Amino acid sequence: MLAKAKYRKDYKQPDFTVTDIYLDFQLDPKHTVVTAITKFQRLNNEATSLCLDGHSFQFSSIKFNGEPFSDYQQDGESLTLDLKDKSADEFEIEIVTFLVPAENTSLQGLYQSGEGICTQCEAEGFRQITYMLDRPDVLARYITKITADKTKYPFLLSNGNRIASGELEDGRHWVEWNDPFPKPSYLFALVAGDFDLLQDKFITKSGREVALELYVDRGNLNRATWAMESLKKAMKWDEDRFNLEYDLDIYMIVAVDFFNMGAMENKGLNIFNSKFVLANPQTATDDDYLAIESVIAHEYFHNWTGNRVTCRDWFQLSLKEGLTVFRDQEFSSDTGSRAVNRINNVKFLRTVQFAEDASPMSHPIRPEKVIEMNNFYTVTVYEKGAEVIRMLHTLLGEQGFQKGMQLYIAENDGKAATCEDFVSAMERANNLDLNQFRRWYSQSGTPELLISDAYDEKTHTYRLTVSQSTPPTADQMEKVNLHIPLKVALYDANGTKQMLQHNGELLSDVLNVTEKDQVFEFHGIYGRPIPALLCDFSAPVKLDYDYKTEQLLGLLKFADNQFIRWDAAQMLFAQELRRNVVRFQQGEALEISPEILTALSYVLNHYEKDIELATLILTLPKEMEFAESFKTIDPDGISAARAFMQAQIAESLKDDFLRVYTHIRLNDYQVTQQDIALRVMRNLCLTYLAYTNLGNNLVQKHYNNANNMTDTLAALSVATKAALLCRDVLLADFEQKWQHDGLVMDKWFALQATRPDDNVLEIIQLLMDHPSFNFNNPNRLRSLVGSFANHNLKAFHNVSGSGYRFLTDVLIRLNESNPQVAARLIEPLIRFSRFDAQRQTLMKRALERLSVVENLSKDLFEKIEKALQ
C-alpha cells in the first residue's frame, strides 16, 4: 500500500470551523441512523471548497441550509463540497448516515461492547460516525439526542448536562444532552446500555454540587466503590494542588469490556476499560487498586489539561498527555509513597521507553511525521513527555511551576494550544530563558551522560566531568546538546552527606548540564567522596559512571535518597548478571558475589525501617529490565543467569526470608499504604522461598489460606514460574473458580503465557480456543498474546522462530478486525536490531511476510516500513 504521511511543518489553520453541532442518533446495533446538523463558519474568504473527513459508514443524504445539495465529491476518506457559488460566512449542513455498530470490530467510532453501544473518537474515530471537520483545532458546542429501545438500553448518555427526555409509544425512549463547553470532535462520547449505577456527589471548593455517576455491568456494583472514592480524591487533590475546579453539573464514568485503550477523557462522560474501574478484594490485586486510582485521576485531570485546553493538532499530543501523566504521577506520589511511585515509573521508562527510543519507531515527544496517528499514543509521548514536564518542575520549583501553569491555563482556556504555548508560559511566568530546554520537544533518543571524577587531596577539591551525547536514532542522525538537570549528592566513606560548595558559596544539588563537556568543581571536600548521580532520576538519561562495587554497596547502605539506594541495587544486580551471561556463553559455572548476598541480607533484616524500599531493593529485576543493559540481547543467557541468581539468593537467605514471611501477619484486607507494603514484602519472601525445598508446601498453603486476590495471585504466579508440583492443581482450581470473569481470567492467561515450559507456545495456541478467551477482546489478546511476546523473553525469541511465526499469524488476523491493537502487539518484532544475526533474520522474515498482506492497515504499514527501511 501507499500511505501518505502528514508533517507537523505543514499545519494550516482550517478554512472553516464549526460553532455548533446537533446530533440525532436512532440507535440499533444493526442499523443506526445518525443525523448531524452542523453550523459552519467561514475563516478564509478565499476558500471555495469544504473537505469533511469520513469513512466506514453508509452515506444517505446531505442538505445545505435546509435544501438538498449535490455539488460534492466522495472518496474513501472524505466528502468535498464545492462552495464556489456559496459565499455566506455562516451556513448549516445536514448529513444523514447509517452505521452497523455490531459489526465494528475496530472499536473506533460507534461500536457494540457486550450488550451495550459506545464510542471511541480519539484520535480520529468521529469520522467513522458522520462527515466532520475531524481535527482537534475545531471546537464546537454539542447537543446530542439519543433514541433507543428502553428495555435494552435504559441508560442513554452523552457529554454535558441532561436537558430533556421522553418516551415513545413503540417502546423506545430518548434523552437529550447539552455540552456548553466547545470541544473538538475527538471528545464526543455516547453510551447506551443497561447498567448498575453507583451515585455520589462532590462539593467543589466554591460550593457547587456535582453529581457523580459510575455505570458498570449488571452485578458489578460491589466492584465500583474504589473507583468512585478515587474520583473524589482526585477532584479534591486537583483543587488543592493545582487550584483547578470541575465545571459541569455532572461527571460520569462508564466501564466497558471491549476497549482498545485504558480509558478516555470525553468531556463529562469518561469511558473506561473495565479493567481500570472494577475492583474488590476477591477479584483485584493491590496493583489493580493502585492502577484504578491512577487512571481515574489521569482522566479526571484531563478536564483541564486536555479538554478545557486541548491540542491544536495531533503532533502536540504530549501537550495534554505528558502534562497529565505528570499530574497523575504527582497525585499518586502525594497520596501514596513518593519513592515507590518514582521508582516504578523509572522502571517502566527504562524498560519500555528507552527501548522505543532505540527502535525504528523512535520519535521526539512532539513528532514531526505521522502516517497513522494511533501509532503515536506511545510511551515516548506519554511517559517521556511527563519526564520533560518533571524536568521543568525541577528547574522551576513547585512555586515557579504553578505560576507557569496558571498563566498557561489563563491564556489558553477554551483554545487549541501547542507545546510551545506551554513552554512559553513557563518561561514568561518565571522570567527564565528556556530556549535550549525546548530541544527536548524536537530531539528523539535517550541522552547519555558519561561522567568521570577526580579528587585533589591538597586543595580538598572534587571535580565531576560530565559529557553529554545522544546516539543517532532511526528518525534523526544529527543531535544537539540538551539542557539536562543532573541532581547529585556526595557522601564520605562513613556515609555523611557533604555540603556542595564552590569558593565558599553553597551550590544547588541540581547541576545544569548544557554543554557537550562540562566540569563541576566542589570545594571543602575532605576525603574522596562517593557520588550519588541522577538523584530521583532527575532527567530521562542513561548514566555511564564507573561505579566500583564498594561504592554501590555504600550507597545502598547509607544514601538518604531512596531512589539512589534502589538504583545502587539495580547496578549491582546488573553487573552480576552481565558477568554470569558471559560465563553462560563460555560454558563456565555461574556464581554470585558474597558481598551482594551480605548486602541483601542486611536490607532484609532491617526491612522494618522502610518496608516499601526494602522490598523494591530485594526484588530481582525482570528479564526485560536486565535486557535493556545489553547492546545485543541474549535471551537464553539472560534467562539462565537470572534464574541462577534467583535460586542462589533464595537458598542463601532462606532462613531470613522464612523468618520475615512468618513474622508478617495481616487479618482483614485493607487497601492502605502500610498493608500493601507488608503484603508485598511477605509475597516477595514467598517468591524466593518457592525456589527452595520449602517451596511447594509453603506456596500451596499460601494459596489455600489467601483471603484476597493479591495473595492468591502471588502464590499462583510463583507456582507457575518456579514450576512447582502444585502448579497444575492451583491453575485448575483458579480456572474453575473464575472462568466466567474475563478480567480475572486475564491474570490466568498472562501467567500461562509467561510460564517457563519448553512447550509454552503449544499451551498458548490451545488457550486461543479456551471458552473464556475472545479474540475480539483487546484485554484477552493483551493478556495472552501480549504477555507472551513482551514478557516471555526466552520462549518468544526461541531460535526456531516459532514465537515470531505465531505472532505474525495473530497480526494477520488482527489486521482486518482491529489494526490498532495489532500495531501495539507488533512492537517486539520491530526491535530486531537488538538481537543476534540469526534472530534478526527470522524477525525480518516475519515482517516481510506481514508487509505483503492484502489490504495492510496504515497502523501496521507504518511500523513495518520503518523497521525494514
Swiss-Prot record:
It is found in: Cell inner membrane. Its EC number is 3.4.11.2. The active site is at E299 (proton acceptor). Substrate binds at E122, G262, A263, M264, E265, N266. InterPro entries: Aminopeptidase_N-like_N, Aminopeptidase_N-like_N_sf, PepN_Ig-like_sf, Peptidase_M1, Peptidase_M1_dom, Peptidase_M1_pepN, Peptidase_M1_pepN_C, Peptidase_M1_pepN_C_sf. Its cofactor is Zn(2+). It catalyses: Release of an N-terminal amino acid, Xaa-|-Yaa- from a peptide, amide or arylamide. Xaa is preferably Ala, but may be most amino acids including Pro (slow action). When a terminal hydrophobic residue is followed by a prolyl residue, the two may be released as an intact Xaa-Pro dipeptide. Its main location: membrane. PANTHER family: PUROMYCIN-SENSITIVE AMINOPEPTIDASE. This is Aminopeptidase N. It comes from Haemophilus influenzae (strain ATCC 51907 / DSM 11121 / KW20 / Rd). The lineage of its organism: Bacteria, Pseudomonadati, Pseudomonadota, Gammaproteobacteria, Pasteurellales.
